[in-house]
Amino acid sequence: ERLLPQMFSNEGPSISNYDLNNDGIQDFYIGGAKGQTSNIFMSNSSGYEKISSPFEIHKDSEDVQSIFFDADNDGDQDLYVASGGKAFSKLSRTLNDRLYRNEKGIFKYDSSALSFSNFFSTGAAEVGDINNDGYLDIIIGERFDVDTYGIPGSISVLINRGDGTFETSYPPELKNIGMITDISITDINADNKKDIIVVGEWMQISVYINSENKWELVSDKIGLKDTNGIWQSIESDDFNNDGIPDFVVGNMGQNGFYKPNMKFYLNDFDKNGKLETIYTYKINGDDYPIHDRDELIKQLPELKKKLLYYKDYSVQTINDVFDKDLLLSSYTRYLDETKSLILLSKGSQSYEIIYMPDEIQYSSVHAISIEDVNLDGKKDLILGGNQFLVKPQFGAYDASKGWIMYGSENSNKLFDNFKPLNIYGQIRDFSIVKDLKSSDSLILIAGISDSKIITKNVK
């Protein structure tokens, strides 16, 4: 995949927290990268104890998502761990998601709880009672095809049988919808049924209403038609207190490779049985390949005779380089939006787009946490991101040190001011726990790709 602008080997780590031992202090799970053991950190009188069992047996997986929830309805928290990344064969069991049951405080892997028809790289996992039977179900989003970036992935719906085992279904309306990075489960239309909001790379913000045993896509109807983005994250809350969920959605920002009106074309351009992805920028109404001549010819050697000179290639559009029929038969996607934003409900299933401040658009937003950090009764946003694994000619997304946006006391706006967290690195997840030494202090735990976990007092 020589033509890809970035690598996709830094999806994690994931952090999840819950007070597992009922001591009033949040415990947390940190997922490991490929070759690293995941751990639970359990609070005790002297700090935290690291628990590695039973996660050692799955250290060859890359744990990209994790959720504490009561899977078997026995009153304690079990753990769902999603495996992803691109460093695996699509025939590898290391891509399998896992359920660990909490048995009197000891987590045990349950190999019979989950069943999938094939292996895939998970990009998103969320829980909610989809069928209103009182048991928590799981929605899983496929991140990408591990062999070919660009092929759209699907949603899997795991229905809880009530005993912590799950029946997997693949709704046809949720098949091949995109390269999914995050999911929010909430009731959009106040009908007491859980709906799903799906975001991903080269995807529209996709709102699916849970309607009569099918999922109805309503994004265009509620004002989200032109929202194709490189979305990385989504969280929901009710910021304007109207009883309707609002959303914070993280994108790649305005300071890097991805631009509005950008496209990609996916096809077997050299007829060798393998798909290639060609990216273009739109300039004066025409689409131009972004790849330099040498890298394009290395991937597609038959173009060498056609692209003899650099100066000629520099003015050639995608239609000059490739045959019209080949382009028409390609799977194509385009971008409308690269800014991170807030979707604020306006009632009647419609949303207003509010863009985050310019400084936050300097880099990507991969991690979002919503918390009243300063205890003023207003919801604050904690944001983090960056993506270093971009080709040098395009430049890394490295201008963010994380942000706190403080909720406003002014009813005319959502947030008053913001300040940097001063955390350097590729932030992929956040968790908030109480400070062991101070009951009114909050500790932010930041999961940094290819780096140590960072803790920071945010209150």
Predicted feature locations:
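Beta-propeller-forming repeat regions
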Residues: E1-K459
